[in-house]
Amino acid sequence: VTRSLLVLSGGHPYEEAPFGQLLDALGDWDVTHLIHPEGGEADAADAIGRADMLLFYDMAGYTFANGTVTTHPPSLAFRAAITARFARGMGAVAMHHAFAGWAEWPEWHGWLGGAFLYQPGEWQGEPWPDSGYRHDVAYDARIVADHPVTRGLPESFPVTDELYLCPIDESAFTPLVRAEGFAFTANNFYSAANAVSGAMFSREGWNHPSGSNCIAWESRTCPAPLVYLQCGDGPATYANPHVRRMLANALDYTSGGTG
């Protein structure tokens, strides 16, 4: 029986054709792809309850305009659909910029174990500066756990991708993969708030605590299997065979497969 995969995207630009090739390479799955906001949260809420596998590649809940960003929470129906799915033990995979989505949904970020902040804000009741980003970082992805998501992967493999410097609570998850060969310190990243205001690749007036180098993990706070993969900014990552294997493993695992 062909299993169904629901992919949610939108809210952050990406190259559609290479991403489509990534989805095609994952397996013989019946793929439904809904895009915020055109896909509609109501449509997504209905599909979320039915899909065998769920991939969040969206960054919803933001409006960027004129050098500012505003946020809004997901609809009650959308939240209820995801909460009900997890309550039934049906899992999901969140990828790359999904870590930033739904800034006004604390439960979502509690399940994920962290958040990417486009503006200075709060995480776990503490004030935090806006988060950092760095494109096209060449690093070694090192496997740190024997887990269905990492099955069949070499102990270490090269990745060139965007990395984040942001609040991450390692007590909320089981680490699976870490990025080695690159320091997660403010002087290696750029300010997200500066980028929003029009100053890309700037860290002027910005500082940030050193951060976690964990780039793949399984949540320990979500009632269903929830895996986050920070890999996934662009075509080089989409085409990386080890990233493809890890994503396919994660989708299989979170849908109740054996990995």
Name each model-derived stretch:
Residues 1-53:
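Aromatic-Pro/Gly-enriched surface loop or interdomain linker
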Residues 2, 95-195:
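An acidic, glycine-rich "communication" segment
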Residues 6-8, 32-33, 53-58, 91-94, ...:
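Structural recognition of the beta-strand scaffold that forms the well-ordered cores
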Residues 12-13, 38-39, 60-63, 98-102, ...:
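Solvent-exposed loop/turn segments at secondary-structure junctions
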Residues 16-18, 65-67, 103-105, 187, ...:
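Short glycine-/acidic-enriched loop or helix-start segments at secondary-structure transitions
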Residues 30-36, 68-72, 205:
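Short, flexible loop segments at the rims of nucleotide/cofactor-binding pockets, characterized by
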Residues 48-105:
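Short alpha-beta junction capping motif
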Residues 195-259:
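Extracellular ligand-binding/catalytic regions of CAZymes and related secreted enzymes
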